[in-house]
C-alpha cells in the first residue's frame, strides 16, 4: 500500500537486502548486500546526517537558520546538505579536492556551500580547515568522526533491519568498510549480542592500512581508510581485518554493474571484494552480508567508469 509521508526525512532507512546471483563462485557461500543507495540521498550516510542533526536539535544546540559545517569525503556532506535543506539550515561542506566531481555537484545542488582542501592533506586537512571556519562563523560541527549519534543510529536502525531480514537465515559473516567506523561499530554491537556466531570483518584500503598498524597513504577507495583511527570506531567490534587494493575495489565495482545489474561506488567495490573472499573461505551453505554504501552514478567522472567493463565468462 502506498503511503503519504510528511517529510522526506521519513524515508531514511529500511533499505533492501538482496542476494547476489552472478558474481559469486558456485562453491562459495551466499552473499547478500544491503543497498544503502535506496536512501533519499543515495547513501548510508543519510542515516547519520539525520541522526546527528536531530540529536543536536534535541539538545538545543541548533535550530533552523543556524550554520552547519562539516569535513567529509562526500557522502556525509550530501546527507547533511539535503537534510539541512529540508530542515532550513545553512550548510557548508569541506572536502579534499580529490573527491569526485559528482559529489561536489550534488552537494551544491542541495543548496550547500562547498570548500575544497588540498588532496595531499587528506581528511586531516579538511578537518583542520573546518575547525578554523567553524570558529569564524560560529557554526555547529556534527563531527561525524567523534559523534556518538553516528554508531548509535546504526544500532537503532541498520542492525535491527539486518536482524529482521536474517531471522530465518543464519548470518555467518558481516563485512563492512571502515570510514568513520560508525556502521561497523553500531551493527557489530547488536550482532555480537543477538548473533554471537557471526564473524565481523573490517575492510580497509591496502595502501592505507592504518587498522592493521601500517602508515597512512594515498589510495583510490573514496569513503574508507581516512588515514587515522576515528573515535567512532570501536576497534573491538571486529574480529578480522581484510585489506583491499584499490585496483581490486575498482574492478569489483565495475563488474557489479555488468554482472548484477546495479551500479555501485568504489567503497562498495571494496566491501564486495572482501565479502566474496570471505564467501570463498566459508564455502557453500554459509551466508555473508555486506553493506554497499552508495551508488555508482556519483563516480561516473572518475576512473571507476572511465574504462570499458570486461565481463568475466
From Swiss-Prot:
It catalyses: O-acetyl-L-serine + hydrogen sulfide = L-cysteine + acetate. One of its GO terms (biological process) is cysteine biosynthetic process from serine. CDD domains: CBS_like. Pathway: Amino-acid biosynthesis; L-cysteine biosynthesis; L-cysteine from L-serine: step 2/2. It comes from the Bacteria. One of its GO terms (molecular function) is cysteine synthase activity. PROSITE patterns: CYS_SYNTHASE. The modification N6-(pyridoxal phosphate)lysine is found at residue 45. Pfam families: PALP (PF00291). Residues 215-220 are annotated as: SAT1 binding. Its cofactor is pyridoxal 5'-phosphate. Pyridoxal 5'-phosphate binds at residues 75, 179-183, 267. Keywords: Amino-acid biosynthesis, Cysteine biosynthesis, Pyridoxal phosphate, Transferase. Its EC number is 2.5.1.47. Signal peptide: none annotated. PANTHER family: CYSTATHIONINE BETA-SYNTHASE (PTHR10314). Homodimer. Belongs to the cysteine synthase/cystathionine beta-synthase family. This is Cysteine synthase.
Amino acid at each position: 500500500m502506498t503511503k503519504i509521508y510528511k517529510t522526506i526525512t521519513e524515508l531514511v532507512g529500511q533499505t533492501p537486502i538482496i542476494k547476489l546471483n552472478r558474481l559469486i563462485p558456485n562453491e562459495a557461500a551466499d552473499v547478500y548486500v544491503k543497498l544503502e543507495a535506496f536512501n533519499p540521498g543515495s547513501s548510508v550516510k543519510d542515516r547519520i546526517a539525520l541522526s546527528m542533526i536531530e540529536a543536536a536539535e534535541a539538545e538545543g544546540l541548533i535550530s533552523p537558520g543556524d550554520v552547519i559545517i562539516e569535513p567529509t569525503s562526500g557522502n556525509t556532506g550530501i546527507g547533511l546538505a539535503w537534510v539541512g535543506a529540508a530542515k532550513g539550515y545553512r550548510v557548508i561542506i569541506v572536502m579534499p579536492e580529490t573527491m569526485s566531481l559528482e559529489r561536489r555537484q550534488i552537494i551544491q545542488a542541495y543548496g550547500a556551500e562547498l570548500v575544497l582542501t588540498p588532496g595531499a592533506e587528506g581528511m586531516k586537512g579538511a578537518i583542520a580547515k573546518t575547525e578554523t571556519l567553524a570558529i569564524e562563523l560560529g557554526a555547529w560541527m556534527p563531527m561525524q568522526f567523534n559523534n556518538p549519534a553516528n554508531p548509535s543510529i546504526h544500532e537503532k536502525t541498520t542492525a535491527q533491519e539486518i536482524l529482521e531480514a536474517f531471522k530465518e537465515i543464519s548470518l555467518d559473516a558481516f563485512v563492512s568498510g571502515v570510514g568513520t567506523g560508525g556502521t561497523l561499530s553500531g551493527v557489530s554491537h547488536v550482532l555480537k549480542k543477538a548473533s554471537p556466531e557471526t564473524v565481523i570483518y573490517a575492510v580497509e584500503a591496502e595502501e592505507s592500512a592504518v587498522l592493521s598498524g601500517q602508515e597512512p597513504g594515498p589510495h583510490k577507495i573514496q569513503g574508507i581508510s581516512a588515514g587515522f583511527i576515528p573515535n567512532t570506531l570501536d576497534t573491538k567490534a571486529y574480529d578480522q581485518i581484510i585489506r583491499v587494493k584499490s585496483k581490486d575495489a575498482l574492478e569489483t565495482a565495475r563488474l557489479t554493474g555488468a554482472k548484477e545489474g546495479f551500479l555501485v561506488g568504489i567503497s562498495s567495490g571494496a566491501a564486495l571484494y572482501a565479502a566474496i573472499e570471505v564467501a570463498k573461505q566459508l564455502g557453500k551453505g554459509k551466508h555473508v552480508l555486506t553493506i554497499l554504501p552508495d551508488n555508482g552514478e556519483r563516480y561516473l567522472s572518475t576512473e571507476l567508469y572511465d574504462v570499458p567493463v570486461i565481463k568475466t565468462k
